[in-house]
UniProtKB/Swiss-Prot annotation:
Belongs to the ArgJ family. The lineage of its organism: Bacteria, Pseudomonadati, Pseudomonadota, Betaproteobacteria, Neisseriales. InterPro entries: Arg_biosynth_ArgJ, ArgJ-like_dom_sf, ArgJ_beta_C. The record marks T119, G120 as: Involved in the stabilization of negative charge on the oxyanion by the formation of the oxyanion hole. CDD domains: OAT (cd02152). The record marks A188, T189 as: Cleavage. Catalyzes two activities which are involved in the cyclic version of arginine biosynthesis: the synthesis of N-acetylglutamate from glutamate and acetyl-CoA as the acetyl donor, and of ornithine by transacetylation between N(2)-acetylornithine and glutamate. Pathway: Amino-acid biosynthesis; L-arginine biosynthesis; L-ornithine and N-acetyl-L-glutamate from L-glutamate and N(2)-acetyl-L-ornithine (cyclic): step 1/1; Amino-acid biosynthesis; L-arginine biosynthesis; N(2)-acetyl-L-ornithine from L-glutamate: step 1/4. It comes from Chromobacterium violaceum (strain ATCC 12472 / DSM 30191 / JCM 1249 / CCUG 213 / NBRC 12614 / NCIMB 9131 / NCTC 9757 / MK). It is an enzyme of class 2 (transferase). The active site is at T189 (nucleophile). It is found in: Cytoplasm. This is Arginine biosynthesis bifunctional protein ArgJ.
Amino acid sequence: MAVNLNPPQAGQLPAVAGVELLVAEAGIKTPGRKDVLVVKLDKGNTVAGVFTRNRFCAAPVQLCQEHLAAGVQIRALVVNTGNANAGTGFDGRARALSVCRAVAERDQLQTEQVLPFSTGVILEPLPADKIVAALPALRQADWAEAAEAIMTTDTLAKAASRRLDIGGKAVTVTGIAKGSGMIHPNMATMLGFVATDAAVTRPMLNQLVREVADQSFNSITVDGDTSTNDSFILISTGQSGAELIDSAEQPAYQQLKQALLEVAIELAQAIVRDGEGATKFITVDVNGGRSVAECKDVAYAIARSPLVKTAFFASDPNLGRLLAAIGYAGVADLDVDRLSLYLDDVLVACEGGRNPAYKEAQGQAVMNQSEITVRVELGRGSASARVWTCDFSYEYVRINADYRS
């Protein structure tokens, strides 16, 4: 059951000029459901991406990186669900390449102008023949349908959009994502595609995709597992008529970055809210560190702890688990006497131990909520970090135990 999350509405997801969405049913895993998405891009676009750091990265991830590095203009993306094409060796690469080739031939493109993406079961051969056979049946779709076409264990589709004004020109940012389990940076079993009609040079788009990913998709965890297929793609079509963004010093750069961040954070949070079996959405804020890195270490120690997450599921104010997680986060020479721990606005621990004024009823009241903030004040610097996570429920175990059955 998703936590305070609603399915996207097509009317709230404006089209992005220069982007065409098409979907089809290939019967990869579930007959009759949309499981192939093709994103066609007009000439003059720019594409950037960041990908999983898992050493067993999937064949389509490898091809995406190679095609982007080739320097050709990307004109199409092809996404399949139901099969990850990971752990499939040379054969998996050949199958992914055959899908790229078929999409390219359909639209008179070079194979290198197509980026492939897959998500689903690992160690299974990609049914490339089914995907290729479904291409003639592709039909136009809106962003909401596109979001549905990339779902796996997601219970709800995920999409977001923003509109902004750059120099008197209307600019649109719209994106979709999928993910529900195996979520932990960098990045997650996550596919994210965000498009804008703003005009951005390749160097600036590469910078934007990294900055946006770090503050959104790289700040979430559901279960601490890092997928083989993570991909976050940023597309600039340049068709809004707004000024070209070619420097991070331009006000337009910051305007666009803010809109992209809002969309990406909404998508990233939706993944956590739809975490497999999630009943609670938890924000972990860590402040007062010497570096962002150590703040994130503390935040993730809390956010991925099974003991912490099961306590949240049970609404059990067993908050010593939070202190234990902070203690093993690996922060060098941490002075616990200067640390403060809050549950929402309730001061739970300070000066090395339990706050004398803290009452368990206060903690219980917070733990009963569906949305909770854990705040840690390290008291040793000015850096901060924020991470989003969810609880562990019985349903998480059931979903993953039954995943292939």
